[in-house]
């Protein structure tokens, strides 16, 4: 019971941290590629320190598992680039709600590999699709501009690449999660190094924001997340993961004054309700592992 309680607060804290990342991305004032590069570099250093402090040997890697981890890292970094670009075009809250379609992306991907999808999951999938349609309804009636629609598209694309990351990570069960994250952010450093510029050490360079993104939102957050997943059953981690979009919407309102209108709230509520039903296995006849093996954290 004590381990479960520890897992609950670790998961809750991880989701609270994750919900504030959008604000730090925008407050940095840097191009998306630079924000992601520094997040990867500082995050890699933080994760390396945590791994060394754990005194556990690094998971053995074969050529195939290393390649899969790198491919997962590419997908994860592309996901960050797309999501952070969405923040610049639409509100953080709306981006986050659309981003929570990712479990359904994973369901559809699983079908390509022969995984059976129950009628109940199809029901949740169509309900989430209905939520997306409602979110888009203001655009379909001409009330929004092309930049708004681009933001929605970027958030959906980010969800796709996060789901792809989760699908690849499923194949890496022999590797400790912290070690997977370390390889992934190192991959991000290599990917984005050509686009990085020398930092300024003057007072106008956002070092406090970047250090927070790397240490807190990457190193500490992933350490808490993976530790919680090891302690908690899937239904609890699935339910606690919905702290993330709620916090993102609240932070967006407090920091930038953005709020969802009634139509967006209705569409977002449908998406989050469908994602909860999918993750927690609502309506399934037989006891089974809930959800699709994805924990929402960016």
Named regions from a protein language model:
Residues 28, 35, 39, 86, ...:
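Hydrophobic/aromatic residues within transmembrane alpha-helices
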Residues 5-13, 34-50, 66-67, 121-130, ...:
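Hydrophobic alpha-helical transmembrane segments of multi-pass integral membrane proteins
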Residues 16-30, 35, 42, 80-90, ...:
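Juxtamembrane C-cap of transmembrane helices in multi-pass membrane transport proteins
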Residues 34, 41-45, 84-115, 158, ...:
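Specific alpha-helical transmembrane segments that line the substrate/conduction pathway
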Residues 54-95, 99, 134, 214-232:
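Specific transmembrane alpha-helical segments of multi-pass solute transporters/efflux pumps
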Residues 9, 95-101, 168-187, 218-254:
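Helix-helix packing/entry segments at the starts of transmembrane helices
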Residues 47, 51, 70, 120-139, ...:
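Hydrophobic transmembrane alpha-helices of multi-pass small-molecule transport proteins
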Residues 1-37, 82, 130, 143-171, ...:
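Glycine-/small-residue-enriched transmembrane alpha-helix faces in small-molecule transporters
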């Amino acid at each position: 019971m004590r381990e479960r309680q520890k897992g609950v607060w670790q998961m809750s804290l991880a989701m609270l941290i994750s919900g504030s990342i959008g604000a730090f991305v925008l407050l940095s004032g840097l191009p998306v590629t630079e924000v992601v590069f520094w997040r990867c570099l500082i995050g890699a250093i933080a994760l390396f320190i945590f791994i060394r402090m754990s005194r556990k040997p690094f998971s053995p890697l074969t050529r195939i598992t290393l390649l899969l981890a790198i491919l997962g890292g590419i997908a994860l970094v592309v996901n960050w680039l797309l999501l952070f670009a969405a923040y610049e075009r639409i509100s953080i809250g709306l981006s986050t709600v659309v981003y929570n379609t990712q479990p359904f992306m994973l369901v559809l991907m699983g079908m390509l590999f022969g995984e059976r999808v129950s009628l109940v999951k199809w029901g949740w999938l169509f309900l989430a699709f209905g939520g997306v349609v409602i979110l888009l309804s203001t655009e379909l009636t001409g009330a929004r501009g092309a930049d708004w629609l681009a933001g929605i598209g970027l958030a959906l694309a980010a969800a796709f690449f996060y789901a792809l990351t989760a699908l690849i990570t499923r194949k890496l069960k022999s590797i400790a999660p912290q070690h997977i994250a370390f390889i992934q952010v190192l991959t991000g450093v290599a990917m984005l190094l050509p686009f990085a510029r020398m930092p300024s050490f003057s007072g106008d360079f956002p070092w406090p924001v970047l250090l927070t993104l790397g240490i807190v939102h990457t190193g500490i957050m992933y350490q808490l997340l993976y530790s919680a997943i090891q302690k908690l059953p899937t239904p609890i981690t699935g339910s606690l993961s919905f702290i993330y979009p709620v916090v993102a919407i609240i932070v967006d309102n407090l920091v930038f004054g953005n709020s969802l209108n009634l139509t967006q709230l209705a569409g977002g509520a449908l998406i989050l309700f469908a994602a909860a039903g999918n993750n927690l296995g609502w309506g399934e006849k037989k006891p089974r592992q809930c959800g699709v093996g994805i924990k929402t954290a960016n």
